[in-house]
Design a protein with these regions (language model features):
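Conserved non-catalytic scaffold segment of RNase H-like nuclease domains
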Residues: 1-91
Length: 91
């Protein structure tokens, strides 16, 4: 059984893979069954969110307007996860 892993939750601007963007990455690093570290970043998708996505996630355009783009966040996330197994739903 895997004892060291990272649980990941990703929020997006929609479900259309070609057009929609990641707006939040959240993760918890687990060591021997215990949470030891967290990662949480809001991401500016460079597009306006639909009212549906705002209602679903609680994330607004105002919250994202001054946040970094994915190109800045992704290297930090990769560093956080390292070589760990990633776990998540529908990722």
């Amino acid at each position: 059984m895997v004892k060291d892993y990272v649980c990941v939750d990703i929020e997006t601007s929609g479900v259309r893979v070609k057009w929609d963007k990641i707006i939040e990455i959240g993760a918890v690093k687990v060591r021997d069954g215990k949470a030891v570290d967290t990662f949480s970043e809001l991401i500016n998708p460079g597009l306006k969110l639909s009212p549906y996505i705002t209602e679903l996630t609680g994330i607004t355009d105002e919250m994202l307007k001054d946040k970094p783009f994915i190109e800045e966040v992704l290297p930090r996330f990769i560093e956080f996860t390292g070589d760990d197994v990633l776990m998540g739903h529908n990722i």
